[in-house]
Amino acid sequence: MSDQLFERTMAFAGILQAVAQVQYIARHGDSDKEALAASLQSVLVTNPESTSDVYADKFALRKGYELIVSQLGDAKQKDVEVTRYLVGILALERKLTRSSNAMGMLSERINQIHRQLSHFEITDEQVIANFAGIYSDIISELGPKLQISGNPEFLKRTQTQQKIRALLLSAMRSAVLWRQLGGKRRHLVFSRKTIVDTAMKSLTL
């Protein structure tokens, strides 16, 4: 397995890991704090020496790798909701990377969160609110808004909305990295077996 394929699959798992948390929070109103922290941390690693630097908590990526296997593998039952979120994220990523203005604002806002972390934990409500604000102010303005399905009782809560937006920002960060590593949408059609095999090997490491 080539290093680039391994790293590209890792970044793709990062997208799906964040998407899985969005789905869970929308349905259940809560999240795994460690998984949430791992996804948010990936947003802050903007100049990594390797993809592994972005995803320091390898265990947190397990759900992402498992989703690669189930969504791109031979399983008959695909999660259409996960697919819809993924397609939306990849479409927004293209708009983001084509806008130097948006990328500049994104970098500036991420630096503000770095400074905030000298006073708060990454899963503190104020920090999550800032991650969510970045998504609302910059990413949401780029194109059609993602329609999140779930329990209306949870979705109307401000904290739930902020966690979802913060995680969508994390998914965007992984999508940008996936593209930088050579990821293309056609790979998800024509190279599915290779991606699935790589994900399965990654699950055993």
From Swiss-Prot:
Keyword Cell membrane in the entry? The reply is: yes
By what name is this protein known? High frequency lysogenization protein HflD homolog
Cellular component terms (Gene Ontology): cytoplasm; plasma membrane
The protein's topology relative to the membrane is: Peripheral membrane protein
Location of this chain's protein in the cell: Cytoplasm; Cell inner membrane
- Xref: Gene3D superfamilies: HflD-like
Locate the coiled-coil region(s) and give their ranges: none
Q: Which family does it belong to?
A: Belongs to the HflD family.
Encoding gene per record = hflD
Q: Which UniProt keywords apply?
A: Cell inner membrane, Cell membrane, Cytoplasm, Membrane
Please give the organism: Shewanella pealeana (strain ATCC 700345 / ANG-SQ1)
Domain of life of the source: Bacteria
Under the heading PANTHER family, the entry gives: HIGH FREQUENCY LYSOGENIZATION PROTEIN HFLD
